[in-house]
Amino acid sequence: KEAGCRFCGACIEVCPTGSIMDQVKIMKENRSMAENIVPCQSACPAHIDIPRYIRYIREGEFDKAAAVIREKVPFPETLGSICNHACEGECKRNELDAPLSVCRLKRAAAANESGAWKERVRREPATGKKAAVMGAGPAGLTAAYYLAKKGHEVTVFEKNPKAGGQCRYGIPAYRLPDRLLDREIHTILEAGIELRTNTQPQSPDQLLKQGYDTVLVAVGTHKGTRLPIEGSGLPQVYVNTDFLKQARLGTPLPLSGRVMVLGGGNV
């Protein structure tokens, strides 16, 4: 059936007679074999095995699908809500009709899994090594999660009251609800990670002197960029990141009278 074709082009490569012709140029000359065969996975920054977890979803195996996603990222439901899904832009189904909804499928896998995958998570024996992570945003927590699975003792330091980084303080709750983010952070910490909020180490050297074997700096990019125009530094001209963070903290910046917003994107 035509609808059953994922438009991956694999049949062209393995056909022993050459009878299957690449008439629409599925295989691009300027791409590697991996990029041609599974372009969605190649386009994904985390290189998640997208075809495999979609196959599990189709079979109703949501736990297996979630486990495949968590091989690469510990935030499947968060990504399913806010990912910019570069994979969909490279989906071979674009050549036929429309791309698969990879991002929403990722969220469906995370929302419907039972948590049974936790029983099968492999954790290597304790190494005796201590790792410190500065910043409890998505990068810091992801690193902490996989370091813990490697058997290292991990402590995460976060200067804000709660973990989450830009996911919590830079994205409005209507796009990424706190309950969803809290649930995934809780799952990450269950790997045996210690989280210290409202704590800001002076420097990586300070942590090394305290006995940590290695330090990862994952403080994020919370500083916004002002437009290079006259008056951008005047009082009551606010940068988007500052405004969003203060709003999420419940202390919005003072506004009155007429308000102008420069920029028509999501922010």
What is each PLM-predicted segment?
Residues 93-129, 183, 210, 237-240:
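Extreme N-terminal leader/targeting segments of oxidoreductases
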Residues 66-73, 84, 105, 166-212:
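N-terminal Rossmann-like dinucleotide/flavin-binding domain of flavoprotein oxidoreductases
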Residues 215-217, 221-244:
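Glycine-rich beta-alpha-beta "Rossmann" dinucleotide-binding loop(s) and their flanking helix/strand
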Residues 152-168:
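Glycine-rich FAD pyrophosphate-binding loop
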Residues 10-27, 39-59, 80-109, 155, ...:
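Iron-sulfur cluster-binding cysteine motifs and their immediate structural context
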Residues 55, 145-146, 168-169, 227-231:
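Short amphipathic alpha-helical segments
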Residues 134-157, 196-211, 223-225, 242-267:
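Rossmann-like dinucleotide/flavin-binding elements
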Residues 1-7, 20-43, 64-85, 117-134, ...:
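Ferredoxin-like iron-sulfur electron-transfer modules
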